[in-house]
Regions:
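Extreme N-terminal starter segment of soluble prokaryotic enzymes
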Residues: 1-6
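Structural detector of well-ordered beta-strand residues that form the stable sheet scaffold
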Residues: 96, 158, 208-210
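Short beta->alpha transition motifs characteristic of CBS
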Residues: 46, 50-53, 114, 126-132, ...
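N-terminal phosphate-binding loop and adjacent alpha-helix
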Residues: 8-25
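C-terminal beta-strand edge segments of enzyme domains
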Residues: 214-327
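Cys-nucleophile CN-hydrolase/nitrilase-fold catalytic domain and related Cys-dependent amidase chemistry
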Residues: 16, 28-118, 188-205
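Active-site catalytic loop in hydrolytic enzyme cores
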Residues: 76, 81-86, 93, 101-181, ...
């Protein structure tokens, strides 16, 4: 049993360090409420490149914003991740947060989900496999080596970013690793279709689901960006729609639309075990004698054993050196 939190708060748009500092403040806040896990939206650092929907790619406004966005993408590890890591250490929090990542020696950006442990260590990094629609002008494609869960003292946590959650095989890879809490950071505004997908994942995986949507209002933009006149005065550009669901696919917190808020829920992991008594998609209901799954040439058994097949891929998985992560 433990409290989990979905943090629906706007980023400090196009200012990566300010975003990290806001995240640190929210981490402290949810810790005071007894939470052990905090989940932030997709691309919380440095915000969503929403200008793609409001201006032509060959316009001067677009070019200026695109350059600024790329400059505010973060390296991992870096000053922004250390800011978040320090907050995790100070408050013994586990955190999942969306960022735009820029590798140190490459020109490609990635839509990345980072996991931090209560000791400040970066426990995992998942790069979005398939950017959606015009997102392909912004982010590159991740590979399967980052489809991994993380072990925490409270639960096995995994996640997918936005429309990745519609990919059944990607979900199955996480299920085979014993996922108990599924985080789904998104830019989706909590539509009925999105909430239906979250219910499906909770029902299919028999686990807790934390969906955290991006909240962005015209009033949240920096003055110089608002002054470009691309966005209607006072408009809600993304309404958030965050929600927390239990393993019976019931919404127990939210959905929260158009407001800055933090959702909390008591997440009892015993509920996941009980729910799987009737249906276990990769266990007794998986029919591993009929179905199989491979990921980058590694066979993923549909029956969870004592060891994860993902360990066969460990040589290909990025890890933060302990000396760096500990600062």
């Amino acid at each position: 049993m433990g409290i989990v939190a979905a943090i629906q708060t706007p980023p400090i748009y196009l200012d990566s360090m300010a975003c990290a500092q806001r995240a640190a403040e929210r981490i402290a806040e949810v810790a005071e409420h007894g939470a052990w896990l905090a989940v932030f939206p997709e691309t919380f650092i440095p915000g969503d490149p929403l200008y793609h929907d409001y201006t032509a790619p060959d316009s001067e406004h677009f070019k200026a914003l695109e350059r600024r966005f790329a400059e505010q993408a973060i390296t991992v590890p870096g000053p922004e991740t250390e800011c978040i890591a320090a907050a995790c250490r100070a408050h013994h929090m586990t955190v999942a947060i969306g960022v735009t990542e820029r590798p140190a020696r490459a020109g490609t950006l990635y839509n990345t989900l980072l996991y931090f442990g209560p000791d400040g260590m970066i426990l995992g990094r998942h790069r979005k496999l398939m950017p959606t629609f015009n997102e392909r002008m912004v982010w590159g494609m991740g590979d399967g080596t980052t489809l991994r869960t993380i072990e925490t003292p409270h639960a096995v946590v995994g996640g997918l970013i936005c429309w990745e959650n519609f990919m059944p095989l990607a979900r199955t890879v996480l299920y085979t690793q014993g996922e108990q809490i599924h985080v789904a950071p998104t830019l989706n505004p909590g539509s009925e279709r999105w909430l239906s997908a979250m219910r499906q994942i909770a029902n299919e995986g028999r686990m807790w689901v934390i969906s955290v949507g991006c909240l962005m209002r015209e009033s949240d933009l920096p003055p110089d960006v608002a002054a470009l006149g691309l966005f209607e005065k006072g408009a809600v550009l993304n309404a958030g729609g965050s929600a927390i669901l239990n393993p019976n696919s019931e919404i127990v917190a939210g959905p929260a639309q158009g407001v800055e808020t933090i959702l909390y829920a008591e997440a009892d992991m015993a509920e996941t075990l009980y729910a799987k008594r009737t249906f276990d998609a990769v266990g007794h209901y998986g029919r591993s004698d009929l179905f199989g799954l491979t990921l980058r040439g590694v066979e993923i058994p549909l029956q969870i054993g004592d060891s994860s097949p993902m360990t066969q891929m460990s040589d290909h998985v990025w890890r933060v050196p302990q000396s760096v992560a500990e600062g």
